[in-house]
Design a protein with these regions (language model features):
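C-terminal lid/capping helical subdomain adjacent to the catalytic/cofactor pocket in oxidative enzymes
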Residues: 12-13, 31-40, 53, 74-128
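Conserved mid-domain beta->alpha element of the FAD-binding
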Residues: 1-68, 72-73
């Protein structure tokens, strides 16, 4: 009936490969609080639906990419390991002091802008 919100691991447990478990809980709390502040007096259930819509996609993408990272970090095949390591080296050579597009998407999320509905860039996660 729209009166309960889950957040953090209760809503979307994370594997440790992007160190996002606690971070996602903090993002959830911020977006939920701000969404309720902005819309909760008029229609709390609608505010909770908005919170879910704002957070669900990002959390699901992070879960998927964390599963992908698990595979990358635990390869058994020597050829696959060599291919992975070559990709890491190329990135380091091409961009020694910067972040990948994926890292920017991961670490530059602005919960305030998301809650206000003014930042849709977080939806477009580049392929890893």
């Amino acid at each position: 009936d729209g009166r309960i919100a889950l957040m953090g691991d209760a809503a979307h447990a994370m594997l440790p490969y992007h160190a996002q478990g606690a971070v996602q809980g903090i993002e959830d709390a911020w977006v939920l609080a701000r969404t309720l502040q902005l819309h909760g007096d008029d229609d709390p259930a609608a505010a909770l639906r908005r919170y879910e819509a704002l957070r669900k996609h990002r959390a699901q993408r992070l879960q998927q990419h964390s599963r992908n990272a698990e595979r990358w970090y635990h390869l058994d095949d020597a050829d696959e390991v060599a291919h992975r390591d070559a990709r890491f080296r190329r990135h380091a050579e091409d961009n020694p002091d910067g972040f990948t597009k994926q890292q920017v998407w991961l670490y530059a999320y602005d919960a305030e802008q998301a809650a206000l509905g003014t930042d849709d860039d977080w939806r477009a996660l580049p392929d890893w």
